[in-house]
């Protein structure tokens, strides 16, 4: 068997593990560098790889949803992250949610047991020689950030993500809550906590006036919309919450048969159903304030909080000025970046960037012809978005149909149009799968 050059991957998060896996299964030796367990970022709590620090949901599974399309593309292309997610999923209606501990352990064990992957523990503070994929994440250490800054000659852009609290299932007052999924889709997997107009008013007022934990450099204007702290959301207007994360439409209270004034949904956080997270309630309030404010919700009056929400720094590159559509540094193509540091936002999006970076590097090492990735697939559309030099003010982006090429013909109905875009994408993915078959 031919001996290929070793590729270094920095960071064993979702993107780094996916990149390492795509290289390793193609017989390319990988050095996977991870600073845990020697050092952890402020948002990490375990020594596992691919630790989920925000929600436990990988979002919709439906092909009429761009997140569902992206997962299906990766699933067909033998993604490690999606495979492990499928194995450790918990009930969540039409979404793919996972038992976060089982998921991380599954990824960790798979990576550690592959003979082509060598784990190098410890913090990386400078660029390794040879081909390298930097997947150090949104919480890149100060030392590596300095090395990247010196290499690219550009300033990073920074913002902050927030994680939601988790409560025990047994502490939820089910006499004041009910099980349902919106519009009755799928199985009734969410616990719904209704609020009257008076209760909503009290909850919102408490949110707006609660004391926040100190966060260096935090500014409301820099908060990414997809992971906005609930208290920042509340300040934007009286009805912002009830038209957003507390939207009651499609969730009638079985006691009245009518939609409540507002509803907080709780989503299962582990396979056993013993833990639930507060959907959309990412926060950076002080811990004591979190308990006080969320206990205003009747069903959570006596809730036991096993994890409070935390706020953490997120750092990403001005990628359109730096990267090509394979995530390679234009000025030094031996270097690729992957994951949220590139400006893709979300778990599956991070895995997708790691997949493309790892696969493309593997093809280069093996001196095989490269693939053309365009906006007709979700994987390609993300790569094209982060490398689009026409974007003046670059901001992180979740996958969405707006970044994919539209159809060349008109289709009646948004859902059907999206389904046809997905069908086109998956046909392309199937042809790619044939070309890269192991």
Predicted regions and their residues:
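A short alpha-helix-loop-beta-strand transition element characteristic
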Residues: 63-67, 71, 79-92, 152-161, ...
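Internal hydrophobic alpha-helix adjacent to the cofactor/substrate pocket in enzyme cavities
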Residues: 350-371
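Beta1/beta-strand and adjacent pyrophosphate-binding region of the FAD-binding site
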Residues: 3-15
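N-terminal FAD cofactor-binding segment of flavoenzymes
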Residues: 21-83, 375-386
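C-terminal auxiliary extensions adjacent to catalytic cores
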Residues: 394-438
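Feature captures the FAD/FMN-dependent oxidoreductase FAD-binding
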Residues: 73-147
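A glycine-rich dinucleotide-binding beta-alpha-beta segment and adjacent secondary-structure elements
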Residues: 278-282, 286-344, 351-353, 371-387, ...
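Predominantly flavin-linked oxidoreductase catalytic cores and closely associated redox partners
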Residues: 113-287, 291-292
